[in-house]
Swiss-Prot record:
InterPro entries: ALOG, ALOG_dom. GO terms for molecular function: DNA binding. Belongs to the plant homeotic and developmental regulators ALOG protein family. Residues 183-194 have a biased composition (Gly residues). One of its GO terms (cellular component) is nucleus. It comes from the Eukaryota. Pfam families: ALOG_dom. Residues 1-22, 167-182, 195-212 have a biased composition (Low complexity). Keywords: Developmental protein, DNA-binding, Nucleus, Transcription, Transcription regulation. This is Protein G1-like7. Probable transcription regulator that acts as a developmental regulator by promoting cell growth in response to light. A motif (Nuclear localization signal) lies at residues 156-160. Residues 1-34, 148-212 are annotated as: Disordered.
C-alpha cells in the first residue's frame, strides 16, 4: 500500500460540501407595530428639523402639542368654525371655507402609539412627554371642540348586556340594534395613522399622512 495515497480524511474532505442552513426571514411586523414604527420615525425626524434644535431628552408635553398642531396641515377632516352656517351639522349640504384638521380619533390613537414607542426606546413612564397631563387636556379640548363643530358626539361605547339576562326567545328590539350599530360607527379618521408617512418639517409642508 502506497503511504502517499489519499487517506480516509482526504476522501472525506473531498466529498460533497455541507449545505449551510438558509437564514430565517425576519418576522413580519403587525399592522400596529409597523404603524408605531413609522410614527416614531416621523416624530424623531420632526425633532431633527425643529428650530431651535430639539433632542428627545428635552422634549416636553408642550413640544408634543406643537407636533400635533403641526400635523393639522395634513388633516382631511372638516372642522367648522363657530361662525360657519354649517357649524354643528354632521352632514352639511354644501362646501364651506372652514379648514381641514386631523380628526380627534386619529390624534388620540397616534399619541397612544408614540407613548408606547417612547418607553420601548428606553424612556421611563415618569419622563414620557406623550403621557403628560397637558397632552391629555389638549386631546380632550380637541375632542369637545370637534364634537360641537361637526355635530358628532364622542361617547364611550356601552358594554352590551349579557344575552343570558334576556328572557329566552326574546330578541333585542329594533331600537337597541340601531343604537348598537350607531355606536359601532364614528369618525372615519379614528385610529388612523396621523403621521404615518409625513415628512416632518416644522417650517414647511410635507407628504400627507396616510389617514386623518
Amino acid at each position: 500500500m502506497d503511504p502517499s495515497g489519499p487517506g480516509p480524511s482526504s476522501a472525506a474532505a473531498g466529498g460533497a460540501p455541507a449545505v449551510a442552513a438558509a437564514p430565517q426571514p425576519p418576522a413580519q411586523l403587525s399592522r400596529y407595530e409597523s404603524q408605531k414604527r413609522r410614527d416614531w420615525n416621523t416624530f424623531l425626524q420632526y425633532l431633527r428639523n425643529h428650530r431651535p434644535p430639539l433632542t428627545l431628552a428635552r422634549c416636553s408635553g408642550a413640544h408634543v402639542i406643537e407636533f400635533l398642531r403641526y400635523l393639522d396641515q395634513f388633516g382631511k377632516t372638516k372642522v367648522h368654525a363657530s361662525g360657519c352656517a354649517f357649524y354643528g351639522q354632521p352632514s352639511p349640504p354644501g362646501p364651506c371655507p372652514c379648514p381641514l384638521r386631523q380628526a380627534w380619533g386619529s390624534l388620540d390613537a397616534l399619541i397612544g402609539r408614540l407613548r408606547a414607542a417612547y418607553e420601548e426606546s428606553g424612556g421611563t413612564p415618569e419622563s414620557n412627554p406623550f403621557a403628560a397631563r397637558a397632552v391629555r387636556i389638549y386631546l380632550r379640548e380637541v375632542r369637545d371642540s370637534q364634537a360641537k363643530a361637526r355635530g358628532i358626539p364622542y361617547e364611550k361605547k356601552k358594554r352590551k348586556r349579557s344575552q343570558a339576562a334576556q328572557p329566552a326567545g326574546v330578541e333585542p328590539s329594533g331600537s337597541s340594534s340601531a343604537a348598537a350599530a350607531a355606536a359601532g360607527g364614528g369618525d372615519a379618521g379614528s385610529g388612523g395613522g396621523a403621521a404615518a408617512t409625513t415628512t416632518a418639517q416644522p417650517g414647511g409642508s410635507g407628504t400627507a399622512p396616510s389617514a386623518s
